Amino acid sequence: MLRRDFLRSSAIGFGALSLGQRELLSHFFDDPWKITMLKNDIGIFTEKGGTIGFLLSKDGIITIDSQFPEQAQHYIDEMKKKGGYPFKLLINTHHHGDHSSGNISFKGTVQRVLAHENSKKNQEKVAQLNKTEDKQLYPNEVFGKVWEEKDSGEKLTLRYFGAAHTDGDAIIHFGHSNIAHMGDLVFNRVHPFVDRSAGANVKSWMDVLDKTLKQFDKKTTYIFGHAAPGYNVTGTREDVKAFRDYLEQVYNFVDAQVKKGISQEDLVKIKTLPFDTEWKGDGLDRPFKAIYEELTMYK
């Protein structure tokens, strides 16, 4: 039996067991999360949602993104095992729930919450629409273009290069270790979600990635929010460039279809791209719809 089939069938039976039986059986399963150390006390936590990045420091732990409340609590519990350092700073790369819903788990624990000014506005707007204000921990600090702070031998810099995945995407760079957390500015071999309701712009997104490649060098390690099965949530400038080129190819394809008079309804029926690409599978309708709207909104 394949491992995934075993886990699927086991999970079904797992729910029918008593509490004591479940606690006993749970010891035979691996934790659903994974911690990977990258360099100089900087690591990543993956479970469900956007990749969490962190810096372990005696002065306090710096955390980037928070996934969902349950996953954030798993992360918090694991960090407490790594020295009991206080949680000093929580940074959100942007406002989406799979990156910021877990903020609430840090309430009363973290001293500061930081994000781009548009990210905070977007988080507040979505929470008000969904009537989930009581489930939020909003940033108590915001920045516009650049934010810098030195911490434990690291020069921590946040940069905003413009609208992309949303209109509030921050890049977080650890200068000494040369590691940049991109949030959802790079979808590694996954068709991207483009949040037009939060000011996303694919044309500008390409420019943001061009600026990113100019800002950082060939030795920079990048952390990505999401990756396709078989790919990593860390990578190099070649992965950033590959995603930038993918966006341009998709943009040009949709532009050509729009000039031919295609409707959005017919456009999203196209399931494969007419060029060689590592971006495959479901979700092509996401960039198609966004680019179509971007190209036709003033027509």
Predicted regions and their residues:
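N-terminal secretory signal peptides and thylakoid transit peptides that target proteins
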Residues: 1-14
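Metallo-beta-lactamase
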Residues: 37, 119-162, 166-167, 175-176, ...
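Active-site HxH/HxHxD metal-binding segment of metal-dependent hydrolases
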Residues: 80-148
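Ligand/cofactor pocket segment of small-molecule handling proteins
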Residues: 151-205
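Divalent-metal (often Zn2+) His-rich catalytic cores of metallo-beta-lactamase-fold enzymes
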Residues: 206-262
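C-terminal regulatory/interaction regions
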Residues: 260-299
